[in-house]
Amino acid sequence: MSLYRKRLKIIKGEGIYVWDDQGRRYVDLIAGIGVAILGHNHPEWVEGIREQLNKLVIAGPMFNHEEKEEMLEELSKFVNFEYLYMGNSGTEAVEAALKFARLYTGRKEIIAMVNAFHGRTMGALSATWKPKYKKDFEPLVPGFKHIPFNDVEAAKEAISKETAAVIVEPIQGESGVIPAKKEFMKALRDLTEDVGALLIVDEVQTGLRTGKFLAVEHYKIEPDIVTMGKGIGNGIPVGLTLTNFDVERGKHGSTFGGNPLACKAVAITLRILRKERLIEKAKNKFIQIDADEVVTTRGKGLMIGIVFKTTIGKYVEELQNRGYLVHTAGQRVMRLLPPLIISKETMQDVKLAIEGVINDLRGGEN
């Protein structure tokens, strides 16, 4: 259950920091696995949520409310998709995307990627790759197949007029922060268009974090469906499924999706991101780790994967001892998903801390 041999009990957060029950402060480079995009207790966000709690929390999906209108207005400043479905998590956003693709095309086949991660509900889990997540829940949803990530020839062979959709992460997070190649993303777009299939881009982890609102913008292609979650609500559970086509009303739904509190959380989060230009600034906060034990540093902006030659348990532990919380993506990749409010200077401190730990532990046992 824990990354750490000694599991922390976190009791409060402020900005980029969290504190444990012993009063120790840590730089939080996990941010709830990429969720606390504005950091902890951002004053403007907290005040807006407090006001909403005192006003209206739930209304039901059959009603409109001003918080939804406010959210849509803010969202329209970043993207121009025509339709939006709101759920309560990233995996729900993916479930909706898969259902919409089958509804719209009338086809059943979904093509996903080797080493993909899209969530743990049954449809999203069927698109996810790792057997360890899936084996105890089989049989899963039929109609899914996986092709090697970044393999154009495999995509050409797999995508056909039987395909409803291809689903892909612009950067595979869970498998080690591996960016898609430009030629691969372009091929997916061209191949799906050629056969009338849809392209679903899963931005649950990459969204907001890479220097652009959507990481797919780096590839200069336009997907048919985009899924978002994690940081879009800054801690309030939200999932968004964005499309340029409509589906028949009543074919999918959510009791809590689109509630006033969630809509307000998204609206405030987007407004702060826009006013403080945090998404744009993220592209200049990427750090490169220079150490013999490191093979490479991957990712974009504030989605960073540091690939080690050996397993990284001892480095994760020692960084915690020195006041830095980091995540992992496999046994040899250290993953950083800090709040976007972190400064460039602090990211340089993080770089020095990681390099210092590597240097001090050089030659020790994992």
Swiss-Prot record:
SUPFAM superfamilies found in the cross-reference section: PLP-dependent transferases
GO biological process, one term: L-arginine biosynthetic process
Pathway(s) annotated for this protein in UniProt: Amino-acid biosynthesis; L-lysine biosynthesis via AAA pathway; L-lysine from L-alpha-aminoadipate (Thermus route): step 4/5; Amino-acid biosynthesis; L-arginine biosynthesis
GO molecular function: identical protein binding; pyridoxal phosphate binding; transaminase activity
Location of the protein in the cell: Cytoplasm
Catalyzed chemical reaction(s): [amino-group carrier protein]-C-terminal-gamma-(L-lysyl)-L-glutamate + 2-oxoglutarate = [amino-group carrier protein]-C-terminal-N-(1-carboxy-5-oxopentan-1-yl)-L-glutamine + L-glutamate; [amino-group carrier protein]-C-terminal-gamma-(L-ornithyl)-L-glutamate + 2-oxoglutarate = [amino-group carrier protein]-C-terminal-gamma-(L-glutamyl-5-semialdehyde)-L-glutamate + L-glutamate
Residue positions binding substrate: R120, S254
Positions annotated to bind pyridoxal 5'-phosphate: G90, T91, F117, D202, E203, V204, Q205, T255
Reported cofactor(s): pyridoxal 5'-phosphate
Transferase in keyword set: yes
Keyword field: Amino-acid biosynthesis, Aminotransferase, Arginine biosynthesis, Cytoplasm, Lysine biosynthesis, Pyridoxal phosphate, Transferase
The record's free-text note on cofactor binding: Binds 1 pyridoxal phosphate per subunit.
Positions carrying N6-(pyridoxal phosphate)lysine: K230
A cellular-component GO term for this protein: cytoplasm
Protein EC: 2.6.1.118, 2.6.1.124
Pfam family, one: Aminotran_3
Annotated signal peptide: none
Family the UniProt entry places it in: Belongs to the class-III pyridoxal-phosphate-dependent aminotransferase family. LysJ subfamily.
Stated role: Involved in both the arginine and lysine biosynthetic pathways.
PANTHER family: ACETYLORNITHINE AMINOTRANSFERASE, MITOCHONDRIAL, AMINOTRANSFERASE CLASS III
Quaternary data: Homodimer.
NCBIfam families from the UniProt entry: argD (TIGR00707), PRK04013.1 (NF003087)
Protein name: Putative [LysW]-aminoadipate semialdehyde/glutamate semialdehyde transaminase
Organism expressing this protein natively: Pyrococcus horikoshii (strain ATCC 700860 / DSM 12428 / JCM 9974 / NBRC 100139 / OT-3)
Higher taxonomy: Archaea, Methanobacteriati, Methanobacteriota, Thermococci, Thermococcales
